[in-house]
Amino acid sequence: MAGGAWNRRTSLIVFGIVLFGCLFAFSIATEEATKLGTVIGIDLGTTYSCVGVYKNGHVEIIANDQGNRITPSWVAFTDGERLIGEAAKNLAAVNPERTVFDVKRLIGRKFDDKEVQRDMKLVPYKIVNKDGKPYIQVKIKDGETKIFSPEEISAMILTKMKETAEAYLGKKIKDAVVTVPAYFNDAQRQATKDAGVIAGLNVARIINEPTAAAIAYGLDKKGGEKNILVFDLGGGTFDVSILTIDNGVFEVLSTNGDTHLGGEDFDQRIMEYFIKLIKKKHGKDISKDNRALGKLRREAERAKRALSSQHQVRVEIESLFDGVDFSEPLTRARFEELNNDLFRKTMGPVKKAMDDAGLEKTQIDEIVLVGGSTRIPKVQQLLKDYFDGKEPNKGVNPDEAVAYGAAVQGGILSGEGGDETKDILLLDVAPLTLGIETVGGVMTKLIPRNTVIPTKKSQVFTTYQDQQTTVTIQVFEGERSLTKDCRLLGKFDLTGIAPAPRGTPQIEVTFEVDANGILNVKAEDKASGKSEKITITNDKGRLSQEEIERMVKEAEEFAEEDKKVKERIDARNSLETYVYNMRNQINDKDKLADKLESDEKEKIETATKEALEWLDDNQSAEKEDYEEKLKEVEAVCNPIITAVYQKSGGAPGGESGASEDDDHDEL
């Protein structure tokens, strides 16, 4: 670099004047409450998602259209439609390249991130590089290939959760609290908010999952100060948090964890065990057979769940490969042996979180289990042993605790929480230290890790060179002392500083983290009042406004397409229901069997048989075709039925029976 350029532009040196470092806690946001409707709480999980709402003084966890209170975070594409949840997951074995799961591992990350590179090898669908970000490439229909951002796939899951809540509440929902792992950095939080926008949701708050779990737990624990350890071992991530609860006031003391440890890793170990076993017994390597792997993955998960309550399970899969049926036992002891190192690995973050909080084991009053994987007896035992025999608390359903807490927070924000939540004060924390680079590549920390947010800190810096007119502010997150070992979030220049001897100018740098953990940085030359600022967004691969708008539009088009598919299915079901209803009536002695002339019966039989054959040959006909066919069959059957009932003085059962049935979706 030329000498002159070096004089004008260099790093900063700490002048050491700390102006202020106030912490602000937040309670009920009344100004927000005035403009928010009902605010639902969504736990957007790596493997499963869950939605709740605060209603009539308590939280309701809402079941989906399959009757399940947790929904797989899976999306699948077939030639005719897009599936979300159970339907998508069930299709994985036969449709692996077009079934997308674990997208939370990609959201807010760069394509060359080592985690993304590692995960690419573990999923059957294709991940491609677009503008340095990982996008998912799938065939949607008629051989058409499309790429989706992780935000778009997450938005599809959020839409499913939103629709689940809307069906239960009987009204449109616009506002939500969405949870993220405590370890999510700013890019991942921003991307999660963007996913909400694409799904048509205003994400009123992003809160940490363990914090949400603590709220779920805290409602009935208002007496005195308690230290609580939240142990959250889900399908994809592991988080440990230590909180204090004092008369309804929550404070997070520390967080730790592992972004890649959870139930799926335990499933993977079971799969690897069986893949080796199959190779040994049958000489067949199924590790590249996506269809077989999909079937095996589903059974591995089922076996793991069963082993939490029984000591042995038989894994049975019909026609796993080459027409060979698979049947093998798996004991709890073998399962524990396969995962022993992973189970033990969970204790490291527990110890680190304890050290960060500055607490002894005896000072933990309650241990709260969150996430389905905490049902595993060995995990519970290791935790109990670590805390010298203290029993973990099981008063909260581990699958639902996070959504429950998010729903309570939603109740607070919407003002629907009432007396039960009015005393809750929620203090969240910054998951990683935030700072800037100063001379020598030093990471100068402005907001230490675990600082309560929202927060604002300012510090005055000065110039390193005489006559320096520009400074570059480089913003980093991380715990290391040199910026080369931390993560660059963004940078900007403050220009137009009046030339002066080194150490003279005063440049005030202000870091502000809002309640969602999103960072704004401002630098101001105190002499001239000139300032520059940055919200850490696009520099970190966040979607642009245009991209978000395009994705919102596409999401609406998908919704329109989904609506058309549903209308087509409804029309088909109406025809099928009418035909079967008619066939039942003409063969039932209590209904029409004895009242019809043989030629009348034959006419109806011919019309219904022909309709069923037409249905078999026209599986994917259009809605109008099904409606037209129904009219044709009705034109034959209804006059006969009406005449019969007029003769006998009854109601024309064929018509009313059929139309009544039309109002109900078939299971």
Swiss-Prot record:
A motif (Prevents secretion from ER) lies at residues 664-667. GO terms for cellular component: cytoplasm; endoplasmic reticulum chaperone complex; endoplasmic reticulum lumen; membrane; nucleus. Residues 658-667 have a biased composition (Acidic residues). Glycans are attached at residue 618. It comes from Nicotiana tabacum (Common tobacco). Probably plays a role in facilitating the assembly of multimeric protein complexes inside the ER. One of its GO terms (biological process) is protein refolding. It comes from the Eukaryota. It is found in: Endoplasmic reticulum lumen. InterPro entries: ATPase_NBD (IPR043129), BIP_NBD (IPR042050), Heat_shock_70_CS (IPR018181), HSP70_C_sf (IPR029048), HSP70_peptide-bd_sf (IPR029047), Hsp_70_fam (IPR013126). GO terms for molecular function: ATP binding; ATP hydrolysis activity; ATP-dependent protein folding chaperone; heat shock protein binding; protein folding chaperone. Keywords: ATP-binding, Endoplasmic reticulum, Glycoprotein, Nucleotide-binding, Signal. Belongs to the heat shock protein 70 family. The keyword ATP-binding applies. PROSITE patterns: ER_TARGET (PS00014), HSP70_1 (PS00297), HSP70_2 (PS00329), HSP70_3 (PS01036). Residues 1-25 form the signal peptide. This is Luminal-binding protein 4. Residues 644-667 are annotated as: Disordered.
